[in-house]
Swiss-Prot record:
HAMAP family: Ser_tRNA_synth_type1. This is Serine--tRNA ligase. GO terms for cellular component: cytoplasm. SUPFAM superfamilies: Class II aaRS and biotin synthetases (SSF55681), tRNA-binding arm (SSF46589). Catalyzes the attachment of serine to tRNA(Ser). Is also able to aminoacylate tRNA(Sec) with serine, to form the misacylated tRNA L-seryl-tRNA(Sec), which will be further converted into selenocysteinyl-tRNA(Sec). L-serine binds at T231, A232, E233, E285, S385. It is found in: Cytoplasm. The gene is serS. Its EC number is 6.1.1.11. ATP binds at R262, S263, E264, E349, I350, S351, S352. One of its GO terms (molecular function) is serine-tRNA ligase activity. Pathway: Aminoacyl-tRNA biosynthesis; selenocysteinyl-tRNA(Sec) biosynthesis; L-seryl-tRNA(Sec) from L-serine and tRNA(Sec): step 1/1. InterPro entries: aa-tRNA-synt_IIb, aa-tRNA-synth_II, aa-tRNA-synth_II/BPL/LPL, Ser-tRNA-ligase_type_1, Ser-tRNA-synth_1_N, SerRS_1_N_sf, SerRS_core, tRNA-bd_arm. Belongs to the class-II aminoacyl-tRNA synthetase family. Type-1 seryl-tRNA synthetase subfamily.
Length: 427
């Protein structure tokens, strides 16, 4: 959420930033609503002050046995109480209107984010590794998985409908191995603390990270009003909600391996075959909570941690910076890491690492107190996939496929899968 004080002082900056994201200007509307609210707050405060003063004057009048004055003051206090009952309700309503309006405004892109409308305007930063030249036509993961007998979409559809997968045998073990490998890397070498969070959260948590109120259709909701997490970013970031974090403990770095649940609203017809776009999928998430001065450097560090996963697995990838029109709602800047999929002959996203500034910190009311200062500031938050486990499975299958349809296991994963070096067709 953006600061209304900042908007009052920088209306043109806001409107220019919204234009970069392809949105209409909103500063005039927001400032007018805030002025109306502030005017009402002033009237309420004046009435409260007069009520308190009149109440004291009643006591003085009674002590002086000036009953006429006392009665007039009592009548005035009564009128002020009636006025305040309605005025305070109006103040709450106006404050909520402003808060609701602010909650739907996206974050302000950093100055170095490239201008653009969609993913075609994203800018490639680097490529690591060279795609393998196969002596045969490489297959897509679902062709490989079904031929091996360990990937079953038909039975998954029978159980749950479209966009689900049943993995069996060594492919199920391989997906589990990938998640464990990533967690071990991030916790033992990258300084993250592993967390096992709830998979269902309240409205406040999903609001804090920015999925609510604007993107509710992308989420699954339980009958008792909780939300299935679309990413572990939600519970990990909200660990510090409504808290003042010790400055000496920053940065806080959390990681988790969780199932994630997404309705994939608006994705009809996209990636309908295979595991690329699922309602339920495994992902390792990284979250950092920092002070204002450290968040830019932390973004580079987090992205490097995600890249290291793919380097260890020997998977070719590229890193791109998203343009203003392709960034997520809460991001100031986002790096996408795209892994090479030879079956599709293209790069596909496997990680997205974003710095959000104090956008989520303000929504969560999560603060820290800088050393030597009495006042607090909102924390800065960052989140990144470290990485999407299902998509890593796809990448391993496609990049390590053999001509006979078997899958070679990357050396880094072999200790996690009982020393197995190859996945072959089920007997």
């Amino acid at each position: 959420m953006l600061d209304i004080k900042w908007i009052r002082e920088n209306p043109e900056t806001l409107d220019k930033a919204l234009a970069k994201r392809g949105a209409a200007p909103l500063s005039s509307e927001l400032i007018a609503l805030d002025e109306k609210r502030r005017e009402h707050v002033g009237k309420v405060q004046a009435a409260q002050e007069r009520r308190n003063a009149a109440s004291k004057e009643i006591g003085k009048a009674m002590a002086a046995k000036d009953m006429g004055t006392a009665e007039k003051l009592k009548a005035e206090v009564g009128e002020l109480k009636d006025f305040l009952a309605h005025a305070e309700e109006d103040e709450r309503r106006l404050s909520k209107e402003l808060s609701d309006a602010l909650s739907t405004i996206p974050n302000i892109p950093l100055d170095d984010v490239p201008l653009g409308k969609d993913e075609s305007d994203n800018v490639e930063l680097r490529r690591i590794g060279n795609p393998h030249n196969f002596s045969f036509q490489p297959k897509e993961h679902f062709e490989l998985g079904e031929a091996l007998g360990y990937m079953d979409f038909e039975r998954a559809a029978k159980l749950a409908g479209a966009r689900f997968t049943v993995l069996k045998g060594p492919l199920a073990r391989l997906e589990r191995a990938l998640g464990q490998f990533m967690l071990d890397l991030h916790t033992t070498e990258h300084g993250y603390t592993e967390v096992m969070p709830p998979l269902m959260v309240r409205d406040e948590a999903v609001y804090g990270t920015g999925q609510l109120p604007k993107f509710s259709e992308d989420l699954f909701r339980t009958t008792d009003g909780r939300w299935l997490i679309p990413t572990a970013e939600v519970p990990l970031t909200n660990l510090v909600a409504e808290e003042i974090v010790d400055m000496k403990g920053l940065p806080l770095r959390f990681t988790a391996l969780t199932p994630c649940f997404r309705s994939e609203a608006g994705s009809a017809g996209r990636d309908t075959r295979g595991m690329l776009r699922q309602h339920q999928f495994l992902k390792v998430e990284m979250v950092s909570i920092t002070d204002a001065e450290s968040s830019v450097a932390e973004h580079e560090r987090m992205t490097a941690c995600a890249e290291e996963v793919l380097k260890r697995l020997g998977l070719p990838f590229r890193t791109v910076v998203l343009c203003t029109g392709d960034m997520g709602f809460g991001a100031q800047r986002t790096y996408d890491i795209e892994v090479w999929l030879p079956g599709q002959n293209t790069y596909r996203e496997i990680s997205s690492c974003s710095t959000c500034g104090d956008f989520q910190g303000r929504r969560m009311n999560a603060r820290y107190r800088p050393e030597g200062e009495k006042s607090t500031r909102f924390v800065h938050t960052l989140n990144g996939s470290g990485v999407a486990v299902g998509r890593a499975l796809i990448a391993v299958m496609e990049n390590y496929q053999q001509e006979d349809g078997s899958i070679h296991i990357p050396e880094a994963l072999q200790p996690y899968i009982g020393g197995l070096t190859r996945i072959e067709k089920a007997a």
